[in-house]
Amino acid sequence: MKCLKKFAWVKLSRYEIPLHAKGIMIYFLRLASRAAFRKGTARYCGHINAVDVGSWVGGMVGLKSILEVKKRRDALEIMDELQMLGYITYTLDSSTKILTYKISDWVLKCSGKACKEGNNIYTTPDYGFLCMPRNITERLVEMGHKFGEADAWLDLWCHTVYRDKGNAFSFLAPAVQYGKFSSVLTLETLGKRWKWEKTKVWRFFQFYCAYFPLHRLPGSFGCVIYNRCYPTQDECDDPSDEEIMRILELIRIKARNTHTEGADNERINRFVAWKSRKVIQELEDEYTKEEIQ
């Protein structure tokens, strides 16, 4: 199953969400994970309430449980910040104490059919997956928000591509790519994006190496970052250094007569975008010949 850069959304298994991590997006993921995956009704304190797709209806106790906070004030501050950022809308009825929130970026294609009262409309914790808009973290970047760990984690996940012909490295396994010319990344680039120092970026990848292994390229080219846990229908082993270097070598060979200005990282990113299609075709031809033999 491909995950092309042009796709507007990516899949995120609820089981993979790093619930221990800090950052505003972990609260968003908690809320999204408990929202209704299809239209229906739900009971709260004897009342039957209509629940729309991507919404949740309940009380403050339930909300605090979802967010895993103890104080009402803390829960409402989180909801206010998420609403200010445009990730949710919510209302709290002062008379009935019923709180309703709706995920603004809900992907309707992932929703099931409407169901009648008595059937389950909410998801089971740690089961299934969320459909996340690929650009969901961009507003944090645009607002100059300093990322938390969960924000950075989701940022990498939502910029995962797989078998995209503009990135030959993604034919080995799901890889992280920011834009057409950003398949090879540097710690400095990510630090600038997340408002982190380089050493903090390095510690992040050391801690989350089970999710996002780094593969350093020679010199000052940068790193290829893979997403080890992204769901595919293929069995993807971790790419070996030999496989990655083979692709890099082919890209450089095909780009040897191509002149472009800029630092090494800028140049290699252009070469990857320009030459990946030819490299992929060559590797597929080699594989076909081996199969015939």
Each language-model region and where it sits:
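Short flexible/disordered coil segments
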Residues: 94-114, 157-164, 218-239, 284-289
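Low-complexity, intrinsically disordered/propeptide-like segments
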Residues: 7, 15, 32-34, 70, ...
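Short, amphipathic alpha-helical interaction segments positioned at domain boundaries
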Residues: 105-143, 232-271
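Short recognition helix of helix-turn-helix/winged-helix DNA-binding domains
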Residues: 1-61, 95-181, 185
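Append "and, occasionally, other polyanion-binding protein interfaces
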Residues: 164-165, 176-196, 232, 253-293
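Winged helix-turn-helix DNA-binding recognition segment
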Residues: 37-101, 164-228
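Charged/polar, solvent-exposed surface patches and flexible loops
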Residues: 33, 65, 77, 138, ...
